[in-house]
């Protein structure tokens, strides 16, 4: 079950870490995936597909780009990496109301919003699979006048612990 469990982590288990903080009224949201011991082949392939989606979608994070376009490109990249049935309602969201809060605007297929300079978004590529676990690559992103700035420097790798 990717959502919960009542046992201890075992070798091969994925550890999805999705964290944030609240400082002076500003919230953050970042996520990474770890694996206890060496990753299984499927785990590595899933993470690689999410990374391809993250890279493809990130390339479009700039003023004037429709959030819906980022959704399409991100999902298409993950599907092209060998997972044609992958579907996700959104690949990110606004920040600000509180920790653990996913708020408008959403990077979704039906979004009508376009990115503007000064927007701060959480851009994410998650996947939750029963029998495998939960994976996520997520960064907080500032939309700048000319593109975007990732707001942390954590590694994106599937990290073995």
Give, region by region, the residue ranges found by the protein language model.
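Active-site neighborhoods and metal-handling regions in enzymes and metal-associated proteins
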Residues: 1-161
């Amino acid at each position: 079950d990717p959502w919960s469990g009542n046992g201890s982590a075992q070798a091969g288990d994925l550890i999805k870490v999705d964290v944030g903080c609240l400082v002076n009224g500003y919230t953050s949201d970042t996520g990474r995936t770890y694996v206890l011991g060496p990753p299984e082949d499927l785990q590595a392939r899933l993470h690689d597909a999410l990374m391809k989606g993250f890279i493809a979608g990130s390339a479009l994070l700039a003023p004037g780009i429709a959030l819906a376009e980022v959704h399409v490109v991100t999902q298409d990249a993950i599907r092209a990496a060998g997972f044609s049935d992958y579907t996700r309602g959104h690949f990110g969201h606004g920040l600000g109301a509180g920790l653990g809060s996913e708020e408008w605007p959403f990077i979704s297929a039906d979004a009508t919003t376009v990115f503007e300079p000064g927007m701060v978004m959480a851009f994410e590529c998650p996947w939750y699979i029963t029998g495998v676990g939960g994976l996520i690559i997520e960064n907080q992103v500032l939309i700048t006048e000319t593109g975007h700035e990732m707001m942390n420097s954590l590694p994106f790798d599937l990290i073995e612990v």
